[in-house]
């Protein structure tokens, strides 16, 4: 068996197209563009790349992009003041504070300052609570993107056994909550789980988000399982001085056993920004009091 490749790049392009169409419809009804604000503190190179990409994608989707770039030595109080300003701005529907923040800042305090109804990253404790009890709220972009890929591939997930490897607040925990809501039987595992290969081998769905290069081997995978690889790890390439990206799953061996698998790159990665745009647009409709059909996006 050779696994089918789950093309996150193609799915993300389709999702962006739907977002663009609905952004146009929103502007016609609300008399303004949906707006996404991104706040960057410091000059971390990776964060700068992410922020540029998010701003470009926001504009391409037909939404307004607001970028606030602050120096690394910005006082926490000044960052909180920017967040409060964005909370009060009716042109801003979604707020994203790019992480990580400088060490002198309390990330949880900053996230808690964001209006939960503008928290399009889904990191606010209120949105985490809403997810846990099944109420509408914003879900972190990466796990929601994973769920979209799974439902597109498998349809109804009810009754399937799922293992989520990883327990972070950003991916692992919300991923488990989303799968529980789809009536999966969910096990949350991690690097210290006893007999981890045996645990994974029981799963119809494997979501790997543990941050360890190629940790999940092909002989861990149940034949016919669907594998979602969230990992993005840079490892030495074949040529000296070169690097390459790999996931948390040993793709070559897993692809011989699984029925479907996401590649790295080109799998989950493209979904994250596409879902961010989706969340920002949902926020715009809610903030404007305009009904958005649950299956529209």
Curated annotation (Swiss-Prot):
GO terms for cellular component: cytosol. Pathway: One-carbon metabolism; tetrahydrofolate interconversion. NADP(+) binds at residues 166-168, 191, 232. Keywords: Amino-acid biosynthesis, Histidine biosynthesis, Hydrolase, Methionine biosynthesis, Multifunctional enzyme, NADP, One-carbon metabolism, Oxidoreductase, Purine biosynthesis. Its EC number is 1.5.1.5, 3.5.4.9. Catalyzes the oxidation of 5,10-methylenetetrahydrofolate to 5,10-methenyltetrahydrofolate and then the hydrolysis of 5,10-methenyltetrahydrofolate to 10-formyltetrahydrofolate. Homodimer. This is Bifunctional protein FolD. The lineage of its organism: Bacteria, Pseudomonadati, Pseudomonadota, Alphaproteobacteria, Sphingomonadales. The gene is folD.
């Amino acid at each position: 068996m050779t696994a089918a490749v789950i093309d996150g790049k193609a799915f993300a392009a389709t999702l962006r197209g739907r977002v663009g169409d609905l952004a146009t419809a929103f502007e016609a009804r609300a008399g303004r563009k949906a707006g996404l604000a991104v706040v960057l503190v410091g000059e971390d190179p990776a964060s700068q790349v992410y922020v540029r990409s998010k701003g470009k994608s926001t504009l391409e989707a037909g939404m307004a992009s607001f970028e606030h770039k602050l120096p690394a030595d910005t006082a926490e109080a000044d960052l909180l003041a920017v967040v409060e300003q964005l909370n009060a701005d009716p042109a801003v529907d979604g707020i994203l504070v790019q992480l990580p923040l400088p060490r002198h800042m309390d990330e949880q305090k900053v996230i808690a300052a964001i209006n939960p109804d503008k928290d399009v990253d889904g990191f606010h404790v209120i949105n985490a609570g809403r997810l846990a009890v099944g109420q509408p709220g914003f879900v972190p972009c990466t796990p929601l993107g994973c769920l979209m890929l799974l439902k597109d591939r498998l349809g109804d997930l009810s009754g399937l056994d799922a293992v989520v490897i990883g327990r972070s607040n950003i991916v692992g925990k919300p991923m488990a909550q989303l799968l529980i809501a789809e009536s999966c039987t969910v096990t949350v595992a991690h690097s210290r789980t006893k007999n981890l290969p045996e645990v994974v081998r029981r799963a119809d769905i494997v979501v790997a988000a543990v941050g360890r290069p190629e940790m999940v081997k092909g002989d861990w995978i149940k034949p016919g399982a669907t594998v979602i690889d969230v990992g993005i790890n840079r490892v030495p390439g074949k040529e000296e001085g070169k690097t390459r990206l790999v996931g948390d799953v040993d793709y070559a061996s897993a692809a011989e056993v699984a029925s479907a698998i996401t590649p790295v790159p080109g799998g989950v990665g493209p979904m994250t920004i596409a879902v961010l745009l989706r969340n920002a647009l949902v926020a715009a409709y809610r903030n404007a009091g305009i009904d958005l059909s649950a299956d529209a996006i």
